[in-house]
């Protein structure tokens, strides 16, 4: 229910009506009674209707004539207040649609009266509008009268009324046509749609039209009549009308209700018959008028164009063409031709402006333009309307730049401002605004001094006109400067945008349809097959038609567009404008490309290319015929010939870059403007977005880009992207900050351009690749014989293109890489470098790309990708090879796991590096190899392992870089470790391969040839490895030899157990002995010249400063390694059959090395000797885990951590298991003891030969005499114990003699003065040298063996004693080495070594050695004293005889410790030996020993050597105690057994004791020491012993007692004499002191007396002779006389002497007690 018919609304309406009628009644009460009555009856009428009817509104409408009557009467009063009240009430009724047709007629008549009386004009208009808009009851004459009323009010004198009336008319006209449209809608389903009117239809009768349509028809017909200044048929009563208003009304109807004219033939007829002729007639003044033409030539004055009419006509024309083009084809052709004419230069500027605005309206409607093309341009004899429009715009734009000739009246009042469209000849800086010292350009076009500003007139894509909308203007407006140019510019842009988007949209739809059809057609069913064929055929027909239209449109417009756009591009000073022009050119080029229009495509591309480059830039590719035809083409526009203006490039543009042109001959610099850069970006955009349609024009595009990139100084970076180069590279390149910020963007777009090549089809891609290759060839030609930097653009872009097309790389790989390989061989290094960069980058990318199927399943593709890498090996340029190797390295790092069949190729690249190709190449290749060995051995086929070994070995032999050689050896170790760990797998795979090869060989009838055949393939692999290491072991460089040697032996040691048993024969004879022979030969022939330190900063140690010394090291290492293998692998070698021969060869090598004059070699030979002697019984250690033998010197650090070197190997090769491989499951046990013994005796003979040869003193001595070193001799002697263990069963006296000679000779060898500080201990250290220790050890081993050995061995004891005693003698008499003169170390008491420069050789300090030997003698004698051989061979006598020497020397011994040790040893030996001697007294075997012993005592106790001056008192006392010990021994061990001892000997002993008791004084001592230095204790001991044995009642012979008595008598007599003399001299001297000697003597005598008395008292009384007592007592008076002496010392001694006499003061008890015997 609508808002006006709801119960509430109706109720309110009734209330309002009643109140209106009451108000009317009240107003008319006095003056107009009839009206009052009518109003009151009206109230009753309304109430009645409301009461009686349910449908109140319908009842009201039925009775509306009566209901409105009171109000009409009220209006008739002409009273303003009443009239207003009534009109408001009537409007209310109308708005509720309760007015019938009759009532409406009455109302209109009443309104007409009010109009004629000029009353309430605005209210009238409002009422009419309400009446006509709220219902459709008003028709025919009533409607026409209402419309006329409005027109009449439009022409009053009141402006407000006029304007309101104009608006009302417009609304009413619209309402009339809206009614018609609504009527048509209602009858649409009933009546068929009328056929569209044909152009030649006759006029139809109006009677066929329905009511609303008839009203509309009559109205439109009269509007045409009125505009044509004719009388109207229907709008009767019109008094006045303007043409402008009429045209506006016509335009609005045509614009708003086009369907009315298209659907009704009657209306269509009106269009053709009335509207079009009217428009053409009204255009007449505009067509004929020529600005500036002389009027006199024409017979009648030409009517001037009138702006308001002209502008409205153009609006109408725009609507006619836009809405009714299909109806008015011929008429539209006329209109369009007229429009084009209005653009002529001789037309007023305002006319040109509105005309160009009108054309702009069409340019934004591409479908309309398409219709023009189809209707005119494509018809054979028709005007080429579309082409003419485009050309006219171009001519119009060109004309604006042509300054009019002088004398031509520029303006006319009627025509408006002539300069409006544009040209202003301006000063040079016109359009520039100074800002802060800089200059900012206003947007403008500037060409040859003509400056035209660019105005912002509309949004792109919409034609919002300015002057076509000036409906209020009567006079022509003043057109702003540049307006017409701006609109024309927009026309071009919108035209291009519209056409291109339309065609591309349709193309897209067509392609989609084709695709859909194809997809559906791919599985047609039988029933629809025919149907599909039909639709496909229709599709093709449609496409042919569409394509013909598109091509015609482009062909019609491209020349004009290009001419205009090129001119504008050249003239543009505004970035935005330039951008728009370029965008238009780009879209046209792309469209032409899509349609396959090559000429036009290339023309647009050429234009962009030329815009990108500096003016007149010499680029041949752009100066083709295509471009030439363009520059001179003229277009005929309306009979005028307009030449294309060629670009002048004089426009003021900011220069942003200055650079060098890319040419063979250097030219001056060229300048790039910001516009050039903008064009470049467009070119990039074109190529990026439309690469698929460029085809052959890629050549144009890329050539231009290459030149721009060159001028801007962009250089390729990784991946082919271009980045700004360094300033250094182009000193003539100057870039402003403006362009610097652009460069990264340009670079980015360039990259994206080539990235987008991945979306090109294969053919387009080949076009691109071919274009790049030919560009590259040009660049290569330019770079020949030219030092100038080459252009790398093409190469960089080939790379980028390849990278993004990896998914289909196969189709372009060969041409791409083939060309890049050519580039790699170019003489220009920069060019080459980039060729290699591109090639390697492509290979790497190809291998990492995720192909489908993957490379692992597509070996052909993998090898195709890798092949160029191999081809690079044929190029000799080192920089290319370096790139190649770096590429290999990166391939390994990224793809190493999946190379598979590509391995031989990759390894071949590494191995192809020759020694002469420079250090960096070798280093890079080697890095690759390192990576292979560390990471990829498990992933490669086992057949490639030998190649790896060969390549690694070849790097070892390269002599450019030592570290590489050393590290390659480390790699060989790693490889061997890998073989070891993966042995089973490798062996299986190799055997399988071998079987296959064997089969092939048999089929071909050839012999399978491989190294070390017929060893198994896995063993051959090992042997190849050993052979490689063997080669390296004799390399000229010492470090390489050393490392290779260590590795070889470590490898054999660690992994040798994997070899088949038979293969060991090859290892020993072909690898090891062959190597030893070569090393020995090289060592013996090596140069002895000193090698200077290399490079000044590498110091060569003196031990390595000759080639000979360096080879010595190798010899050492090799020999040690071989010996180690013989030791550890003997269980494998011994069963081979010729082991004893191999043993002899090894011993021979050891002997020759040991006898080498090089200390290092000789010493090492002995160490090797030791090694082979420490062999344990085979197989005993099979349960122990084994670690590989490590050679003394670790593998060089350069190699880094070598896997496996320090890792213990799990004993998978436990000897038991391994031997199972060789024979039976039981390991062989060596049972042939005899053979073993022969091996050891061969070793003994070798040892003896080495020992005797090396220790034999030379006959003559000079500076170069070779004397073996101490370490050598030590090692030699140290070998004996180990060797002896094997030969002891057969070791006899002769062998002992041989041994003794060698020991004696070895110990006698002096040492070099250089080495002495390191070997000689100082005298304070009683340290033995290693050699001395070794000698004693050897003897110790022997004596221990003799001790436990059989009886026949024990006869060797004396020989051992002789050897030891000979060594003891060295303590006082060092041995002589031949005739060699040696310096001895200084006297022991100074406790230091003094080495004198002239002496070359220094004798050792033999004292500690001799002393240790003595200790050994004593110990051994303790064990063997009673042994028969020891007794028979007079060993004890020999010992005493040997000891006599140091004992007699005593203080003169080189070392004080010697004589002390000699004494203690003598005492120990005698304590053991004397009982044995007494035991054998009768045999006479010891007779000669006693005199020797007596002489020894004599020499020691009464030595001729004097104590040193610095001997301390305490030391003297200690020495005296030693003397006392000797006397005690005599007392305890000799004298008690005098019966068993020769008498001569006893007599000698007694004489000695006697002598000791008297002559014990020392000759040199101070007064202070006198009481100590007199050897009192010794004297006492001698006395006591003498007395003990003198008075012993055991004395058996008178002779013995006589000796004693005589000794006492002499002693006492001498004492008496000394005392008497002293007393006498004391008395005579008076106060003068006596001489010192005499005082000393008297003191000594007094002490001797006291000692004697003490001794006598202690002795048994029966042993003392009475006569002796008498002599003692007789001394007493003399002693008393001495009391008067003045010397305190004498007094003190006298006191001590007198005290003992107290015992004699007692009266004797009886004579018997004291009596004689």
Swiss-Prot record:
Residues 511-538 are annotated as: Disordered. The modification N-acetylserine is found at residue 2. It holds the Pfam family Mon2_C. Its main location: membrane. GO terms for biological process: Golgi to endosome transport; protein transport. GO terms for cellular component: cytosol; early endosome membrane; extracellular exosome. SUPFAM superfamilies: ARM repeat. PANTHER family: GUANYL-NUCLEOTIDE EXCHANGE FACTOR (PTHR10663), PROTEIN MON2 HOMOLOG (PTHR10663:SF333). This is Protein MON2 homolog. The gene is MON2.
């Amino acid at each position: 229910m609508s808002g006006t018919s709801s119960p509430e609304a109706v109720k309110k309406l009734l209330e309002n009506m009643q109140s209106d009628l009451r108000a009317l009644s009240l107003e008319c009460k006095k003056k107009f009674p009839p009206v009052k009555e009518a109003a009151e009856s009206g109230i009753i009428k309304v109430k009645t209707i409301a009461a009686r009817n349910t449908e109140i509104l319908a009842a009201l409408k039925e009775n509306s004539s009566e209901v409105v009557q009171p109000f009409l009467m009220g209006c008739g009063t002409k009273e303003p207040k009443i009239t207003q009240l009534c009109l408001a009430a009537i409007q209310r009724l109308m708005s509720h649609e309760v007015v019938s047709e009759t009532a409406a007629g009455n109302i209109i008549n009443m309104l007409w009266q009010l109009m004629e009386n000029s009353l309430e004009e605005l209210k009238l208009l409002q009422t009419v509008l309400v009446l006509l808009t709220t219902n459709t009851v008003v028709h025919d004459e009533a409607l026409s009268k209402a419309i006329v009323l409005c027109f009449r009010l439009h022409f009053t004198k009141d402006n407000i009324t006029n304007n309101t009336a104009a608006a009302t008319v417009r609304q009413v006209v619209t309402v009339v046509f809206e009614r018609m449209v609504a009527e048509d809608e209602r009858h649409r389903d009933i009546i068929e749609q009328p056929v569209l009117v044909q152009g030649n239809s006759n006029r139809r009768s109006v009677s066929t039209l329905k009511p609303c349509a008839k009203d509309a028809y009559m109205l439109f017909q009269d509007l045409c009549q009125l505009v044509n200044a004719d009388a109207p048929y229907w709008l009767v009563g019109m008094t006045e009308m303007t043409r402008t208003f009429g045209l506006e009304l016509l335009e609005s109807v045509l614009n708003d209700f086009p369907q009315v004219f298209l659907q009704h033939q009657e209306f269509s007829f009106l269009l053709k018959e009335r509207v079009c002729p009217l428009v053409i007639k009204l255009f007449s003044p505009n067509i004929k008028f020529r600005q500036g033409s002389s009027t006199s030539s024409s017979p009648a004055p030409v009517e001037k164009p009138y702006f308001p009419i002209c502008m409205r006509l153009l609006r109408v024309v725009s609507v006619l063409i836009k809405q009714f083009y299909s109806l008015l084809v011929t008429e539209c052709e006329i209109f369009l031709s007229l429009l084009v004419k209005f653009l002529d230069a001789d037309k007023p500027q305002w006319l040109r402006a509105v005309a160009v605005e009108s054309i702009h309206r069409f340019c934004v409607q591409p479908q309309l333009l398409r219709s023009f093309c189809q209707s005119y341009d494509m018809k054979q004899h028709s005007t080429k309307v579309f082409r003419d429009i485009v050309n006219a715009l171009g001519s119009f734009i060109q004309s604006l730049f042509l300054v009019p000739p002088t004398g031509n009246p520029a303006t006319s009042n009627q025509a408006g401002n002539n300069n409006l469209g544009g040209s202003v000849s301006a000063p040079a800086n016109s359009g520039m605004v100074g800002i802060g010292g800089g200059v900012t350009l206003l947007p403008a076009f500037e060409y040859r001094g003509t400056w035209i500003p660019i105005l912002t007139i509309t949004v792109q894509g919409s034609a919002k006109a300015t002057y076509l909308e000036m409906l209020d203007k009567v006079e022509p407006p003043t057109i702003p400067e540049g307006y017409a140019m701006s609109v024309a510019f927009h026309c071009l842009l919108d035209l291009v945008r519209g056409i291109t988007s339309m065609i591309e949209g349709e193309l897209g739809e067509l392609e989609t349809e084709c695709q859909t059809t194809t997809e559906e057609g791919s599985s047609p069913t039988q029933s629809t097959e025919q149907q599909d064929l039909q639709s496909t055929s229709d599709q093709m027909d449609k496409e042919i038609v569409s394509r013909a239209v598109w091509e015609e449109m482009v062909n019609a417009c491209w020349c004009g567009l290009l001419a205009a756009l090129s001119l504008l591009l050249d003239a543009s000073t505004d970035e935005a404008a330039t951008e728009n022009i370029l965008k238009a050119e780009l879209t046209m080029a792309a469209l032409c490309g899509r349609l396959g229009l090559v000429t036009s495509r290339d023309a647009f591309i050429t234009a962009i290319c030329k815009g990108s480059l500096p003016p007149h830039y010499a680029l041949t590719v752009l100066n083709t015929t295509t471009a030439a035809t363009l520059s001179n083409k003229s277009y005929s526009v309306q009979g005028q010939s307009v030449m294309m203006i060629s670009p002048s490039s004089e426009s003021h543009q900011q220069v942003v870059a200055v650079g060098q042109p890319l040419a063979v001959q250097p030219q001056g610099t060229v300048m790039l403007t910001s516009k050039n850069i903008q064009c470049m970006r467009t070119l990039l955009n074109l190529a990026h977005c439309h690469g698929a349609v460029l085809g052959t024009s890629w050549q144009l595009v890329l050539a231009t880009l290459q030149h721009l990139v060159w001028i801007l100084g962009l250089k390729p970076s990784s991946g082919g992207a271009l980045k700004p180069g360094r300033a250094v590279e182009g000193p003539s390149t100057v870039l402003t900050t403006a362009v610097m910020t652009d460069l990264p963007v340009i670079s980015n777009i360039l990259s994206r351009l080539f990235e987008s090549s991945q979306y090109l089809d294969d053919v387009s891609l080949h076009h691109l690749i071919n274009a790049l290759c030919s560009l590259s060839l040009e660049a290569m030609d330019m770079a020949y014989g030219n030092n100038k930097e080459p252009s790398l653009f093409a190469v960089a872009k080939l790379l980028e293109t390849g990278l993004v097309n990896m998914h289909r790389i196969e189709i372009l790989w060969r041409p791409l890489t083939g060309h890049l390989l050519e580039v790699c061989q170019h003489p220009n290094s920069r060019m080459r470098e980039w060729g290699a960069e591109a090639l390697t980058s492509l290979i790497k990318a190809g291998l990492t790309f995720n192909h489908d199927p993957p490379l692992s399943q597509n070996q052909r593709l993998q090898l195709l990708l890798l092949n160029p890498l191999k081809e690079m090996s044929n190029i000799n340029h080192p920089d290319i090879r370096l790139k190649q190797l770096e590429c290999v390295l990166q391939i390994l790092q990224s793809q190493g796991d999946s190379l598979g069949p590509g391995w031989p190729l990759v390894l071949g690249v590494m191995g192809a590096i020759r020694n002469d190709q420079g250090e960096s190449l070798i280093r890079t290749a080697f890095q690759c190899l390192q990576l292979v060995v560390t990471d990829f051995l498990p992933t490669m086929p086992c057949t490639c392992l030998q190649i790896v070994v060969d390549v690694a070995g070849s790097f070892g032999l390269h002599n450019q870089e030592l570290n590489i050689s050393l590290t390659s050896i480390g790699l060989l170790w790693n490889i061997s470790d890998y073989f070891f760990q993966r042995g089973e797998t490798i062996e299986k795979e190799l055997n399988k391969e071998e079987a296959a090869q064997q089969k092939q060989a048999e089929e071909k009838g050839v012999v399978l040839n491989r190294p070390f055949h017929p060893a198994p393939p896995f063993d051959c692999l090992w042997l190849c490895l050993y052979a490689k290491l063997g080669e390296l072991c004799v390399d000229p460089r010492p470090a390489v030899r050393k490392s290779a040697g260590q590795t070889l032996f470590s490898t054999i040691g660690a992994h040798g157990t994997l070899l088949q048993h038979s293969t060991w024969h090859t290892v020993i004879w072909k690898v090891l002995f062959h190597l030893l022979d070569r090393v020995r030969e090289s060592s013996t022939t090596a140069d002895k010249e000193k090698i200077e330190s290399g490079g000044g900063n590498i110091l060569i140690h003196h031990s390595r400063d000759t080639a000979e010394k360096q080879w010595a090291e190798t010899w050492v290492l090799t020999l040690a390694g071989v010996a180690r293998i013989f030791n550890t692998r003997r269980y494998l070698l011994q069963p081979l059959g010729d082991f004893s021969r191999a043993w002899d060869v090894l011993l021979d090598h050891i002997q020759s090395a040991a006898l080498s004059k090089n200390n290092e070699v000789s010493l090492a030979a002995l160490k090797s000797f030791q090694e082979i002697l420490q062999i344990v019984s085979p197989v005993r250690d099979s349960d122990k885990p084994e670690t590989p033998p490590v050679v003394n010197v670790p593998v060089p650090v350069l190699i880094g951590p070598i896997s496996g070197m320090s890792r213990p190997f799990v004993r998978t090769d436990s000897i038991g298991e391994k031997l199972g491989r060789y024979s039976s499951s039981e390991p062989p046990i060596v049972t042939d003891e005899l053979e073993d013994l022969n091996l050891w005796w061969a070793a003994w003979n070798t040892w003896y030969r080495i020992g005797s040869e090396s220790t034999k003193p030379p006959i003559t001595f000079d500076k170069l005499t070779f004397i073996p070193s101490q370490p050598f001799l030590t090692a030699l002697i140290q070998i004996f114990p180990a060797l002896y263990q094997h030969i002891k069963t057969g070791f006899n006296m002769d062998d002992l003699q041989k041994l003794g000679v060698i020991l004696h000779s070895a110990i006698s060898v002096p040492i070099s003065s250089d080495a002495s500080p390191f070997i000689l201990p100082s005298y304070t250290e009683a340290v033995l040298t290693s050699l001395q220790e070794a000698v004693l050890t050897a003897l110790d081993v022997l004596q221990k063996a003799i001790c436990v050995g059989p009886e026949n061995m024990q006869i060797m004891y004396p020989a051992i004693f002789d050897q030891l005693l000979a060594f003891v003698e060295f303590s006082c008499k060092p041995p002589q080495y031949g005739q060699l003169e040696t310096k001895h170390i200084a006297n022991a008491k100074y406790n230091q070594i003094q080495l004198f420069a002239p002496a070359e050789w220094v004798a050792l300090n033999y004292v500690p050695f001799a002393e240790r030997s003595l200790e050994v003698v004593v110990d051994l004698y303790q064990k063997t004293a009673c042994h028969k051989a020891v007794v028979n061979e007079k060993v004890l006598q020999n010992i005493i005889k040997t000891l006599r020497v140091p004992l007699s020397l005593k203080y003169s011994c080189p070392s004080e410790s010697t004589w002390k040790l000699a004494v203690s040893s003598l005492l120990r030996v005698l304590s053991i030996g004397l009982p044995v001697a007494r035991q054998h007294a009768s045999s006479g075997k010891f007779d000669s020993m006693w005199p020797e012993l007596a002489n020894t005592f004599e020499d020691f106790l009464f030595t001729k050597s004097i104590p040193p001056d610095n001997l301390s008192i305490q030391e003297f006392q200690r020495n005296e105690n030693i003397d006392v010990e000797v006397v005690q021994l005599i007392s305890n061990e000799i004298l008690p057994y005098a019966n068993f001892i020769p008498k001569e000997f006893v007599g000698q002993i007694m004489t000695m004791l006697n002598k000791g008791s008297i002559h014990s004084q020392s000759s040199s001592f101070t007064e202070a020491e006198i009481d100590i230095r007199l050897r009192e204790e010794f004297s006492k001991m001698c006395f006591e012993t003498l007395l003990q044995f003198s008075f012993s009642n055991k004395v058996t012979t008178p002779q013995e007692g006589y000796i004693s008595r005589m000794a006492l008598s002499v002693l006492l007599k001498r004492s008496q004499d000394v005392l008497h003399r002293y007393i006498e001299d004391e008395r005579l001297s008076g106060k003068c002191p006596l001489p010192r000697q005499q005082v000393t003597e008297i003191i000594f005598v007094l002490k001797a007396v006291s000692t004697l008395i003490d001794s006598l008292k202690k002795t048994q009384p029966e042993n003392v002779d009475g006569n002796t007592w008498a002599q003692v007592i007789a001394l007493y008076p003399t002693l008393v006389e001495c009391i008067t002496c003045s010397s305190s010392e004498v007094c003190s001694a006298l006191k001590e002497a007198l005290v003992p006499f107290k015992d004699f003061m007692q009266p004797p008890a009886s004579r018997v007690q004291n009596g004689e015997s």
